[in-house]
Amino acid sequence: HLSQSPISSLPFPGFENVRLTHRQLVAAVRNDTWKTALGNVQAVYLQTDRRTGWHYVGSAYSHKGAEQGLLSRWSEYAYGDHSGGNKRLKELGAKYIVDNFQYSILEIFDMRALPKDIINREHWWMDTLSSVYHSEDEHPHGYNSVAERNSDNPVE
């Protein structure tokens, strides 16, 4: 099963079969086959907190050709700030994320897709999975902020 196997020994399984722990994510962004696949698409992806079931929906797009799509975004999660700048994820801390989060791909786009189109799909997935945190919710289950959901602007 992919979620329990070491990435270094597995071929890329196809975008629809990606489900990685944080440790596997780190291995994937180092693996040449995975790097090629992830670097050639833009995407809407899902982070799942396996402990609580909460979700975070994010998008990865190349702004002015400067980034390598999903590879750039997931490399940030692997090596940099595990929160991607999200306030609620930051509050959890890096160790919690490493121990409890898994990463999957909801939808892919070729590198010519416009950021606004990807963001529209990201918002659709946020609404579909109810991943936006509202303080008035009796049982919230999402890490996305209202500001993230309402923003129509690509991140600079």
PLM ranges: what are they?
Residues 112-133:
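Domain-level recognition of nuclease-like catalytic cores that cleave nucleotide substrates
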Residues 33, 92-95, 128:
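A generic secondary-structure signal
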Residues 144-156:
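Active-site or metal-binding loop neighborhoods of secreted/extracellular toxin and effector enzymes
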Residues 132-139, 147-148:
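Long, charge-rich alpha-helical interaction segments
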Residues 1-57, 61, 155:
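GIY-YIG nuclease catalytic motif and its immediate N-terminal context
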